[in-house]
Amino acid sequence: MKKFIAAAALFLMSLSFGDKLSAGNFGILGGANFCTTSMAGIKSESMTQWHAGLSYKMNLPLGFHIQPTLLYNVKGSDFNLSETDFTVGYLEFMASVQWGIDLILFRPFLDVSPYVGYGVNHEGDLSVAWKEFGNPLGYGVGVGGGLDIWRFQLVARYNWDFGQIFKPDQSVSPVIGARFRGVTLSLAYFF
């Protein structure tokens, strides 16, 4: 009888603490991008776009979390060249490394997120130029912070693209070295 009661108590304890001891959680996320483009001699303004995707948050010791994410991320910019705009939709993989202090009700954290992506579509006035001279491979790093509250996660991050938007070509010299950069705000829900 004692063994049965001990086994039942252990089973009930495992049910109540199972969520905290799990290896990780799947989640969905979405948010807004406030992107601009750096081009030599051409002024660009921020353009608001969006991103959405799937994520998995792995819990590690000492307050660390690793959060691989697959997302569709639309980046763009408005140029002061007679109302010219340009957007590229990237399929990106991001490996976010987070460190924060668990304060029971919430967890503030710092975030470093290297990413790599592939441009799958493009729109706007520079679309024809991107089709011919565009560099579909994009990569960079994001740095920011966030807050976990229950199953929700809010993250603000500044992203630097290291890859050029256009391939180096002398016929399109104004766009050589053009890169996206900007702020992303994301809200995630983990199951």
Language-model features: locations:
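Hydrophobic, lipid-facing positions within transmembrane beta-strands of outer-membrane proteins
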Residues: 26, 48-54, 91-95, 112, ...
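Short N-terminal segments immediately surrounding and downstream of signal-peptide cleavage
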Residues: 20-39
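Gram-negative (and chloroplast) outer-membrane scaffold detector with strong preference
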Residues: 24, 32, 55-125, 186-191
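Generic detector of contiguous secondary-structure segments
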Residues: 15, 54-59, 81, 138-147
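Cleavable N-terminal export/targeting peptides
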Residues: 1-25
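Flexible, solvent-exposed loop segments that connect beta-strands
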Residues: 34-44, 74-90, 118-137, 164-183
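Predominantly the C-terminal beta-signal and adjacent terminal strand-loop region
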Residues: 65-80, 141-191
